[in-house]
A protein has these predicted regions:
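Active-site beta-loop-alpha junctions enriched in small/polar residues
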Residues: 1-5, 24-25
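Catalytic cores of alpha/beta
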Residues: 3-15
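Glycine-rich phosphate-binding active-site loops on the catalytic face of alpha/beta enzymes
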Residues: 15-32
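Conserved, mostly hydrophobic/aromatic
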Residues: 16, 39, 133
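C-terminal helical cap(s) of enzyme catalytic domains, especially alpha/beta-barrels
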Residues: 28-54, 58
């Protein structure tokens, strides 16, 4: 109940306990339920990945809860939240482009079938936009590409008129099409 629902059973494992009680997404009749998905990842961190475990099922379970039964998962919830592995800072996006291991807690693509994501804001800069394009279009464009800079100018213009929210993916797709698919 005091944010110890993962560290307590993990510590118990280290001292010889063979199991812990847990529930999917930590959902239960009270607060402080241990999320099963967290313990699966903790076990992998402690003992190494088990080839018999389907780790991407964690993402599939979250998608089922979100889309199948309409359960609202907090966007920043570890492992399953929509934005748990999303950066908004251009310097981090640039770091991800150079060496993802430094800026990501683990290989989220390998473990959860979820790539590290970038949300575009006034802090993203050309590096954040480049990473977004790489993820969404598989196009390796340089940060000084005129088309990319045209998108950055549109992002900057949004925040110059006091925008406070991230640029949405539909907006980015539209701006990408305008900049990259011009005839």
């Amino acid at each position: 109940d005091f944010y110890k629902s993962v560290v307590n059973p993990e510590t118990a494992w280290l001292y010889g306990c063979g199991a812990c009680n847990a529930s999917l997404l930590g959902i239960g009749e009270r607060t402080g339920n241990t999320p099963l998905e967290a313990m699966v990842v903790q076990a992998a961190q402690l003992c190494g990945m088990d080839p018999k475990v389907n780790y991407p099922a964690i993402t599939e379970i979250a998608e089922y809860f979100r889309n199948g039964i309409g359960h609202d998962i907090t966007s920043n919830m570890p492992l399953v939240g929509r934005d748990f592995n999303t950066t908004r800072a251009g310097i981090h996006a640039d770091g991800l482009l150079k060496c993802e291991e430094i800026y990501s807690c683990f290989d989220t693509q390998k473990l959860l079938d979820r790539p590290v994501a970038v949300a575009i804001t006034d802090k993203s800069g050309a590096a954040g936009i480049k990473h977004w394009i790489d993820i969404n279009y598989g196009e390796n464009v340089p940060k000084d590409d005129a088309r990319l800079l045209a998108i950055r100018d549109k992002v900057d213009a949004e925040y110059e008129v006091d925008r406070t929210t991230a640029i949405s993916d539909p907006e980015m797709h539209k701006w990408y099409a305008e900049a990259f698919e011009q005839k």
